[in-house]
Structure formats: structure tokens, C-alpha cells
Amino acid sequence: MTDISTGVQLKPGIGDGTVYNGNMSKDTLVNCSPDPENPEKGQASSPRTQISVDDNEESTTEYPSSWKLAMIMISLCLAVFCLALDTTIMATAIPKIADQFNSLNDVGWYGSAYLLTTSALTLSFGKLYSFYSIKWVYLQALGMFEIGSLICGATPNSLGLIIGRAIAGSGSAGIYSGSMLIVARSAPLERRPLLTGILGGLFGVASVVGPLIGGAFTDNLSWRWCFYINLPLGAVTGLFLILFFDGAKATTQRATIRDQLSQLDLLGSLCFLPAIICVLLALQWGGTTYPWHDGRIIALFTVFGVLLLAFAGVQWWRQEKATVPPRLIANRNVWGAALFSFCLNASFIIFTYYLPMWFQSIKGVTATQSGIMNLPMVLAVVIFSIISGGLVGALGYYTPFMVIAPLIAAIGAGLLSTLRMDSNNASWIGYQILYGVGVGCGLQQPIVAVQGSLAPADLPTGTVIVMFMQTIGGAIFMSVGQNVFQNQLMRNLATQAPSVDAARVLQAGATMLRKTVSSDLLPAALRAYNSAITEAFYVAVAMAVLALPGALVMQWISVKGRQL
């Protein structure tokens, strides 16, 4: 079969709606082609149905040697470490940055600029990875991230820092999903769960140690090193990939410039990018900077809704040339994995941000100590990401881990929501471990699922859809958690400690709470703070539970080539 738009020869099952298990036994595909007369076809309604065709692409694929794969994994680990570090390293540096630039009003934009561009551009990188060389698109994304980091480190003012964060976020949009695609091009399917588990575990570690490293740089060197650290690590990543990763040839090598622009779905991007920016700004400003009924918040949500409908219409119209082809969204493995990623990461991000806050405010520890006390959850996530990845490779099936992960995580999250001022060490350590086991078992399985059920030509788009949902889930529920916490804290202080200045408590933050409130009012203020944080934990419990439906719709496809 020939792709008319590019003139590139495609094998059966590649780009024709067939869902492909990249490491199935020879010549075996799962037929998920759309059938207009029976919508259930294309969803692989019978998980035992198999169709034999002549396709041995996986068996003829040449993967890098073991030592080359090791070098590639080192480079990807460094890139993912930098990426995760950049999301949290500023937490302890912001006070000194605000003091140096006299920019307290800009503090919110230091995180938002990075988050907005990352979320808005993630899907666009899916098209780039689909039609151009994965290696060179990835290196360009890495270059953008490095340029943004350099600007942040060298900037003389607050505006430069915001611009640098936006540029770095643009690059980060393609790094994590690109790392997963490089793994897919570098190892057979049965080895990918372990490798993606390593990357996912490292991401969790870097997210939590970020504030610790940021504090060390800020106190002993300069806050600028929070960004300069990315430069040598990124350089090593780029060098290793150039030397050891061959990459894939661009599928547009025979296409004209006009055809390439058509494939990039510029109209869809023009609808989607501002839509994401609108909803994230509305969630960040709503209930904090402006009340929810403010005209600006209502306008942002309205524009988001209109643009989202327009984007959906463009995707339906463009079909295979769309950023998100409807054929893939109709595939239950894709939308199930996307829903699972959205919900589980939404739950995880709330605990990543608010559990250290509980330690700092209720237990009265420093930011560094809170990071250490958060290690039980982090280590559990890392260890069980790797263990579950290894077990998937050995047993063949990822679906059982996707089913048990939200159940364990929901139990752990529920127990964490019971934390009180007098909770002992055994409680908060044990609850964290249980929750971390659940998250670790499930966090990377959606990537394995889409890579095990889609044709090679669909891997970039499928992977990026899942990564986008994971990113946007964290972005949205970071704001949701903040709103729940702040609104509940204001109500609690009004009823339990009415003489405490609530606005001053919010501005002081968790570490300064005990210095802001007088000793006679401190117990009541701490009770109000504890209740507000655990209210945010309830949101995390709900999202962990909501991840389960995404797991239940997944096919039982084996990465070892068997299907139940």
C-alpha cells in the first residue's frame, strides 16, 4: 500500500487502521480497522481474534547492540532527569529570585510559562515525530530546552526569566515522549517495559529531589545554577544520541514542502494551542487571582470550549492528516491508556506538591527535611516502576498491573487523607509506601500498552497522545488541588481561628506558618491547615479511583507475542 500524501510505500497494517502488536509472533496482527456498519469493529471486541497477514517487520528490525543501548539509555536518563528537575527545582529558589528582581507579582509566571508551552505543544510533536526523523526532532527539542535554560540562567531581569521558561517548556514538550519513542526504536517490545520503568522512576526521583537541589544551589552557589545544570547534562545527551542512536528515516523524505505542511495540521494547531492556554490560565487564576464568577475567567472557559469544539471538527475533517486521527481515538487501547494516564498522574501530582507541604506545616520541618520525609513514596514509585516493568517483560501482560495499580494507589491515598497533627512516623511512612507501590505499578504501563497495540507508523502519535494526557492531567489538577486547598484553608481559618489573618498565612507559605501565627493561635491554625491539605488529598483519592475504568477497557495483548 502507498501513502498517497507522501508517496512512501507502507506495509500491510501500517497506516490502514490495523492495530499492530510490535512483537507478536510472525505474521500476526490484531484487526482493529474501522467498520462503518459495526463501530465495535476496530475496537478488537473479541480479544482472542487474530488475523494472519504477511508482515514480519518486527522480526527484521535491527536493534542497537547492548553497549549502544546502554549509552542511549544513559543519554535518555540524563534528559528525563533534567526535564523532571526543571518542573520542581525552582520551588526553593523563587524567594531569592523574587527578591533580586523585585518581581513578587511575576512569581506565578515562572512556573506557568513553562507549563503552558509544554502542555500546548506536546501533541504537535506527535506529528513531527510521525513524519520526520525521531533522532533529529528530538535533538531540536533538546536544543530548545537548552537555549531556554541558558536564557533563564543568564537573564538580567524577570521578563527574560519568563521568556526563557517558555522556550524551555517548548523543548520539554518533545523530550519525554521522544524518549519513549527512542526506547521503542532501540529495544524489542518485551524489553521496553523495564526500560520505560527506569525512565519513569527516574522522573519521579528528579521531581522530588528538585527542591533539595534547588535549595543547595541557591544557598551555596546561585539560583542561576538551577538552570545552568541542564547545559552539561543536555550536551552529553545530545552527543551520545548523535553517536549511538541511528534513529528512523523521515517518512516525508519523498514528500513536497506543501505535502509536509499539510501533514502537520496547522489549522488544528491554531485551534488547539490557544485552547490549552485558555483553560490553564483559567484554572490558575480562578479562585485565587480572580473569583470564579469574574468575567475574565468566564471568558477564558468560553473561548476554551469554542476552540476545543473547533479542534474536534478539524480532526474529524482531516481524518488521517489530523493531529489526533479519529481512528486512534476510537481505539480502546489508546483512549483507555490516555484516561488511565490522565487520572493516575493527576493523583500523583497532588501528593508530589501537597505532601511536602503537610510535613513543613504540620510537622514543622524545613523544605529539605520534607523532601527526605517524602522519600518513602518516591522510592516505592521508583522501585515498583522497575519491578513491574521487569515483570511485564517476563510475563508478557501489562493489563493486570494497570488494574491493580489504581486499586492500591486509591487505598494508599485514602490512608494518607487520614493524616492528622498527631500522626506518628509509622503512619505517614507506611501510607506513602502503599501509595507509591500503586503508582509505580501503573505509571508507565500506558506507554507499553500503546506501543504493544499500534502499528509502528502510529507509535509516535499514540505515544504522544498518552504523554499529553499525562501532562495535562498533572497541570489541571495541580491547579485544582491549589484551589481546593486555598479555599478550604480560608473557610477553616474563618471558623476555627477567625482572628488569624488568612491572607497573610497564605502568603507566608508552609515553612513560615509557625513564625506568622502567634503561639496561642497556632494550634487552631495548624488544625485548619491540616484539614485544608487533606481536602486536597481527597481529590487525589478520587482521581486514583477514576483511573480504574481506563485499565478495565484495555485489551490483553502480550508483549511476548501471545494474546489471551
Curated annotation (Swiss-Prot):
What effect does gene inactivation have here?
A: Does not affect the production of astellolides.
> What are the Polar residues biased-composition ranges?
43-53
Keyword tags: Glycoprotein, Membrane, Transmembrane, Transmembrane helix, Transport
Gene Ontology CC terms, in alphabetical order = plasma membrane
Molecular function via GO: transmembrane transporter activity
Q: Which residues cross the membrane?
A: 69-89, 106-126, 143-163, 197-217, 225-245, 266-286, 297-317, 339-359, 375-395, 396-416, 461-481, 537-557
* Alphabetical list of Gene3D superfamilies matching this protein: MFS general substrate transporter like domains, Multidrug resistance protein D
Where does it live in the cell? Membrane
What switches on expression, per the entry, is described as: Expression is regulated by the secondary metabolite regulator cclA.
Which positions does UniProt annotate with glycan attachment? 23, 220, 425
Role description: MFS-type transporter; part of the gene cluster that mediates the biosynthesis of astellolides, drimane-type sesquiterpene esters that show antimicrobial, anti-inflammatory, and anti-tumor activities. Seems not to be involved in astellolides translocation.
Q: Which family does it belong to?
A: Belongs to the major facilitator superfamily. TCR/Tet family.
Protein's name according to its UniProt entry: MFS-type transporter astH
State the organism of origin: Aspergillus oryzae (strain ATCC 42149 / RIB 40) (Yellow koji mold)
Q: Which gene encodes it?
A: astH
